[in-house]
């Protein structure tokens, strides 16, 4: 992000005195004939830079357009000062699943782009999981495990998300020596860059997991946790009463610090999506997990996902107020904060949005636009921020731009947000693009149920009765597909005007792709009906259309899809 001479055309400054109450603040004004951006913290400053690029220079840096040469972009000099104060202490980012569905093989270059994107969006609390395979290899080596034993425990890159959440072990491995060396170097780069830009990384803390054979190999009291999803062997759970408990926990933290440094926030999710709690004093277990974290890092807070049975009542009753940061993981679809506000613990309003790395358009625009503010009104002392917790990245970027602007906006600004977004996204005002996005925000991007992302019929195994592509998915459409086609028609009106705009190229491909995949959902039903009635003329015409759509996908699409 930059270009020759860009840094000389804009002035920036970190000025802590901008904030009177500890909240992050940025100001955009002018100085010596140049734009002047100040922030009360480094994160506030980078957010202000992102705000200026979007809403003054009309440059939208997005997943499909993460690098840009700004040397030829006009930087308007503000005539008045714009001041923005953030209602969110924390702006959290990522999900363990993201590390396997999207990030498993990212390079240093791709990570640098993402971290810059994070900084421009004001993210100050990212989950950092790259390098955990190295940490565990070192822990188990010191504990006396052989390399063969370690290979049976540490998962491969595409499955480390579920390994780190104690759902499985060893799956997708073993990892070669060069991989461990690569990941350690990459981890140090990622964490260094995050910290350099004012972020506090959330590191995986010790949540009592050990290899499933720990009782035999280490002579400790570790409870078998059975299987996850019927077929994956879960790691064991180390009993907090074991005489070596503190020794093992601190062995973990020592090796974690060697690879990833010390943190102020640690993520642990014991009994995630199951496991066995019989015979375990849960209050004691939660207290010892918290205590060992605090022993290692006295100011640390425990970040826990609100998912499945977590956080259990025993956890909420045991951990002191201020000790937890609860991620209300699916606030946009199945929120839990309304029930009791997590009994006074700090929590974040999170948008999960994406399941399984699916690439179709999907979202809940109205809940996103309104429900963070609703939570703030009901629990003003409990809501400490927002978070994006997608399982997969690089889809529907409009939702992420909105989410991370919410804490810097007033609720009433939401009614014109799409107009401002459209101008930022394409560099100038466009009635056609505004209308197109407005239609999408009321249809495909506004799912009325907790349903996951829609799966495309064309991705399923060939069948005349397609209901899903994957075991947990659905192909059922919840929106009016004619409205999505109408949005595409509107947006195509400006195809000549924006043909060289990378964000337009991406978006028009995305919307047209969605109209085509939507049509196949009903087309396969028509094909099945014609087959059942033995109407071969209709059957041939319909399947020819279906195959034609497949051909379009194979030949003509934007390389981001």
Cite the ranges covered by each PLM segment.
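Acidic/histidine-rich, surface-exposed loop or edge segments in extracytoplasmic proteins
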Residues: 30-31, 95-99, 524-526
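Second-shell loop/turn segments in exported
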Residues: 34-39, 100-104, 177
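Ordered core of a single globular domain
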Residues: 501, 505-554
């Amino acid at each position: 992000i930059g270009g020759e001479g860009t840094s000389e055309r804009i002035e920036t400054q970190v000025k802590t005195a901008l904030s009177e109450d500890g909240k992050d603040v940025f100001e955009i004004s002018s100085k010596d004939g140049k734009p002047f951006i100040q922030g009360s913290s480094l994160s506030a400053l980078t957010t202000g830079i992102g705000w200026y690029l979007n809403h003054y220079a009309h440059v939208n840096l997005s997943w499909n357009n993460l690098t840009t040469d700004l040397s030829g972009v006009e930087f308007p000099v503000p005539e008045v000062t714009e001041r923005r104060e953030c209602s969110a202490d924390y702006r959290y980012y990522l999900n363990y699943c993201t590390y396997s569905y999207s990030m498993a093989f990212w390079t240093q270059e791709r990570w640098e782009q993402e971290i810059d994107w994070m900084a421009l969006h004001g993210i100050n609390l990212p989950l950092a999981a790259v390098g955990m395979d190295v940490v565990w290899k070192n822990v188990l080596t010191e504990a006396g495990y052989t390399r063969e034993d370690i290979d049976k425990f540490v998962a491969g890159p595409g499955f480390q998300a579920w390994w780190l959440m104690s759902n499985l072990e060893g799956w997708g491995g073993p990892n070669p020596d060069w991989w461990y060396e690569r990941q350690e170097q990459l981890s140090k780069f990622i964490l260094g860059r995050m910290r350099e830009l004012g972020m506090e990384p959330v590191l995986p803390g010790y949540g009592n997991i050990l290899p499933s054979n720990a009782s035999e190999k280490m002579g400790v009291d570790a409870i078998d946790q059975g299987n996850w999803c019927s077929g994956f062997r879960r790691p064991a759970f180390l009993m907090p009463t074991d005489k070596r408990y503190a020794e093992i926990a601190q062995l973990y933290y020592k090796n974690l610090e060697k690879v990833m440094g010390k943190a102020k926030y640690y993520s642990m999710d014991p009994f995630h999506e199951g496991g066995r709690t019989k015979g375990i004093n849960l209050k004691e277990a939660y207290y010892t997990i918290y205590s060992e974290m605090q022993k290692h890092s006295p100011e640390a807070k425990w970040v826990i996902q609100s998912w499945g049975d977590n956080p259990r009542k025993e956890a909420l009753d045991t951990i002191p107020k201020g000790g937890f940061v609860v991620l209300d993981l699916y606030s946009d679809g199945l929120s839990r904060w309304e029930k009791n506000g997590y009994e006074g613990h700090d929590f974040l309003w999170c948008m999960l949005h994406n399941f399984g790395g699916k690439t179709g358009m999907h979202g809940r625009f109205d809940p996103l636009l309104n429900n963070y503010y609703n939570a703030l009104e009901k629990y003003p002392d409990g809501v400490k921020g927002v978070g994006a917790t997608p399982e997969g990245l690089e889809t529907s970027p409009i939702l992420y731009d909105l989410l991370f602007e919410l804490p810097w906006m007033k609720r009433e600004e939401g009614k014109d947000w799409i107009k401002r977004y459209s101008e930022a996204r394409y560099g100038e005002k466009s009635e056609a693009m505004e209308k197109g996005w407005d239609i999408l925000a009321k249809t495909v991007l506004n799912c009325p149920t907790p349903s996951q992302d829609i799966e495309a019929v064309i991705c399923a195994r060939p069948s005349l009765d397609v209901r899903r592509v994957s075991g947990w998915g659905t192909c059922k459409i919840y929106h009016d597909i004619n409205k999505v086609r109408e949005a595409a028609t509107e947006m195509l009106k400006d195809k000549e005007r924006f043909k060289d705009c990378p964000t337009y190229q991406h978006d028009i491909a995305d919307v047209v792709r969605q109209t085509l995949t939507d049509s196949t959902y009903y087309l396969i039903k028509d094909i099945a009906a014609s087959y059942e009635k033995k109407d071969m003329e209709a059957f041939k015409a319909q399947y020819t259309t279906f195959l034609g759509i497949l051909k379009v996908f194979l030949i003509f699409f934007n390389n981001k899809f």
